[in-house]
A protein has these predicted regions:
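Flexible, low-hydrophobicity surface segments
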Residues: 18-170, 271, 626
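Conserved beta-alpha junction segments in alpha/beta enzyme cores
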Residues: 182-235, 332-335, 457-486, 491, ...
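Phosphate/diphosphate-binding loops
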Residues: 126, 132-134, 274-320, 543-570, ...
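Glycine-rich loop/linker segments at domain edges
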Residues: 35, 40-47, 173-205, 294-378, ...
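C-terminal catalytic domains of large/alpha subunits in multi-subunit enzymes
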Residues: 96-97, 236-243, 271-276, 305, ...
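Local cysteine-cluster metal-coordination motifs and their immediate loop/turn environment
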Residues: 2-9
Length: 754
């Protein structure tokens, strides 16, 4: 437990006091675009005083808990809540019959039951929820709910699901002459395991009834407006009766995009008339959020004798698990980027997002682009080896450039795409010369013999869209006002650790001309949506709204007072003070703006169209040491060059790069959810292996800046590219060290040693 210095109390519409930590999320940012100011939430996080959703309490608060299915697929015969209600301190036990509104929810398609009523479709599916006076009692009561099941045979093989037409979406992309052929052909089958986002903070929230039939919801989220819409529908209330508030979040990476405990909390709070809090434990968290889709892929690449690609065929099957979540969009992304950042005129891609009784899968950093990168980059290495061409030169000869069509959709790439610059930058970076016992596979324990260790070097280049696609109306609203001698940015954009609280303040400071700015997160009743903190979009979209609002505000103030500059002192004219800042702050100057990215379209029947608003890419070089006798791998260093548009905050970008690379390393050599018959066998951080700081390689990062993006000051989103090709680079390096044709990630010791 972190030491709490005291309590901050606020009274909501219900009249109840919500108690949080004394030191609330942040403070003022000094420094403008291009600087790397200290994060306003950095010290509180470092000292353990940051306010997370788990820290919220309220007067008269109850605790919630969930009864979950022990079967991946079963018919519900009966539910008896009486045993739970006999436990002292239990205030409510709710089932599907108690859902007052729409019985299902879903981020893109409402198909998931709020509480299962007739059938359970995955292991851990919620069947009932309980409210009690303390957490232990709530969990005991949830375990006491007597549910009679009739187990059924689960469908767990995505390829079988595909043949049965159990799919959420199919994709078909055809571009160019389908009879085109090359001089050389390589084929391959590839598989990617199920990865967890593994945020350190589990799902948590607090719902407080307002006494008038409505509720205030404080819960972990990446998209509070869409969460609110789903809660409203299932509660059968008006939109203004549910207010979703941003909270402190201990990591997300896609795990917070889908609703989980949100509706349950509100149902319990409204039923009991008391605030209700829920916090998932780690095992529950593995069933309470979606995961990265496992994928199976077949590729066929054809090229001429000079290494120029002539045709690419691919078949991509991803397992969506029991419910839709974002499977349709992830599949589309995987297919749109199935060729990578390479020029080719003949393409055929087919894809399926299957429905099984495996755990639901959805958004995770990279959103489909990670999986296909494993396939197409292995294919590029195979072609290079067959033709005797250097792997980087093979990629350079086929690199996309601005003005080229995307090889799958035919969309013309209008914004900067420095693929060749990235490749050349990687080639120019010096290789490490490291011979340190501590870096050997097995570490300083000397479980390996240096004589057996082989060094390998591998390369990979990845590409992905920025923002939402396929005609989605992607927008964000922001409000900028003058207050307390500086700028205040109000937004519903969620800070999940990526540094948005710093960047939005930097944008406002630069646009207004003041030296201090604060970001204030507000609830759904106070501002329109900022969209999801996903798709590497917030810097561009919410940043664009902030820039537009701040620019308008500055222009209005200067026009009103006929000034020629705005500074910390106030409105200036001919270098003299015209109106003091203190006076401006009391006059309520503010401006609200809504920013949209360039319009996109859905694909036609051949998969063609202007599907994306922008693109970003990165390249990685991995250096590994491998002991092929023990199957141990040490990732020594990762070099990377990344397309960032304009670097608004270089240190923050480097932080994103290092974190994203470590997730990529995890997928390459250790991270995988093991599901047997639909049951997760490793739902904890003891058995689900994660890279620690001891596994973190040295990282050398080069930020490639180019003008031309429509983001604020030319910025691009930077969160996802570090993850897309880092996995593939590590696997390529292991192939180089061992000579093995590794086609599955994560690469396990038995894949190397046996």
């Amino acid at each position: 437990m972190h030491r709490v210095r005291g309590d901050h109390q606020s009274t909501g519409r219900s009249g109840r006091t919500v108690t949080t930590r004394t030191v609330k999320r942040p403070a003022t940012v000094e420094g403008g675009v291009g600087d790397s100011p200290t994060r306003p939430d950095g010290v509180t996080k470092l000292c353990g005083r940051f306010e997370y959703a788990q820290d919220l309490t309220a007067e008269g608060m109850l605790w919630g808990a969930t009864t979950r299915s022990p079967h991946p697929h079963a018919r519900i015969i009966s539910i008896d809540v009486a045993p739970a209600l006999t436990i002292g301190g239990v205030h409510a036990v709710l089932t599907a019959d108690d859902v007052p509104g729409r019985a299902v929810f879903g981020l893109e398609h409402a198909d998931q039951p709020v509480l299962a009523s007739e059938v359970v479709n995955y292991w851990g599916e919620p069947v009932a929820v309980v409210a009690a006076e303390d957490e232990d009692t709530a969990r005991r009561a949830a375990a006491a709910v007597a549910v009679e099941y009739e187990p059924m045979e689960p469908l767990v093989d995505p390829l079988e699901a595909d043949t049965r037409d159990e799919v959420f979406r199919r994709m078909r992309i055809r571009r160019g002459d389908q009879n085109a052929r090359g001089d050389v052909v390589v084929e391959g089958y590839y598989e990617v395991g199920m990865q967890d986002q593994a945020p350190l903070g589990t799902e948590a929230g607090l719902a407080v009834p307002d006494g008038h039939g409505g509720v205030d919801l404080y819960a972990t989220s990446q998209f509070i407006h869409v969460d609110q819409e789903q809660v409203v529908a299932s509660l059968g209330l008006r939109s203004d009766q549910v207010r979703a508030h941003p909270t402190g979040i201990g990591g997300a990476f896609g795990a917070r995009e889908d609703v989980n405990l949100h509706i349950h909390l509100c149902m319990l709070a409204l039923h009991t008339g008391q605030p209700v809090k829920m916090v998932y434990d780690r095992s529950e968290s593995f069933t309470g959020h979606v995961h990265r889709h496992p994928a199976r892929m077949w590729y066929r690449h054809e090229a001429d004798h000079h290494g120029k690609l002539k045709r690419v065929e691919a078949r991509v099957v991803i397992d969506g698990g029991a419910y839709a979540s974002t499977t349709a969009a992830v599949l589309a992304n995987a297919c749109y980027f199935a060729v990578g950042p390479y020029r080719v005129d003949s393409v055929a891609v087919d894809g399926a997002g299957t429905r099984t009784n495996n755990p639901p899968c959805g958004a995770m950093r990279g959103f489909g682009a990670v999986q296909v990168c494993v396939g197409y980059e292995a294919q590029m290495d195979k072609l290079a080896a067959m033709l005797g061409i250097d792997p980087l030169e093979m990629r350079r000869r086929n690199a996309l450039e601005t003005g080229d069509p995307l090889p799958t959709t035919g969309q013309i790439i209008e914004t900067p795409l420095p693929v060749i610059d990235v490749i050349d930058s990687l080639a120019a970076m010096p290789l490490p010369d490291i011979d340190d016992r501590a870096t050997l596979p097995g570490g300083s324990g000397l479980t390996t013999d240096r004589a057996h260790v082989r060094r390998g070097v591998g390369y990979a280049i990845g590409i992905k869209n920025l923002g939402f696609s396929e005609g989605f109306d992607d927008f964000a609203q922001a409000r900028v006002r003058l207050e307390d001698g500086g700028a205040v940015v109000e937004t519903a954009a969620i800070e999940v650790g990526q540094g948005l609280v710093t960047v939005l303040a930097q944008i406002a400071r630069t646009a207004l001309g003041v030296s201090k700015a604060t970001v204030r997160h507000v609830d759904t009743s106070q501002i329109d949506s900022a969209g999801s903190t996903s798709a590497s979009r917030q810097t561009q979209i919410s940043g664009g709204a902030t820039l537009e609002a701040a620019t308008r505000l500055r222009e209005r103030i200067l026009e009103h007072y006929e000034g020629d500059d705005l500074t910390d002192d106030g409105v200036m004219r001919d270098r003299g003070l015209l109106v003091p800042m203190a006076a401006l702050a009391t006059e309520g100057w503010e401006e609200t703006a809504t920013f949209r990215h360039p319009p996109t379209t859905g694909p036609d029947e051949e998969g063609q169209g202007t599907v994306h608003a922008d693109f970003a890419m990165a390249g990685h070089r991995a250096v590994v040491d491998v002991d092929p006798e023990l199957g141990l791998v040490s990732v020594v260093r990762i070099d990377t060059a990344q397309d960032v548009g304009r670097a608004l905050n270089p240190d923050s970008i480097r932080g994103q790069i290092e974190g994203g690379i470590l997730q990529g390393v995890g997928l390459a050599v250790m991270e995988e959810i093991i599901s047997e018959g639909g049951v997760i066998k490793n739902p904890n951080f003891t058995d689900y292996l994660l890279p620690t700081i001891l596994d973190a390689p040295d990282v050398e990062a080069l930020l490639i800046e180019q003008d031309g993006s429509w983001g604020p000051f030319g910025a691009k989103g930077v969160g996802e590219p570090p993850t897309i090709s880092s996995t593939s680079a590590v696997v390529a390096a292991i192939r180089d060290a061992t000579g093995r044709d590794l086609s599955r990630v994560p690469v396990r010791p038995q894949d190397i040693a046996l």
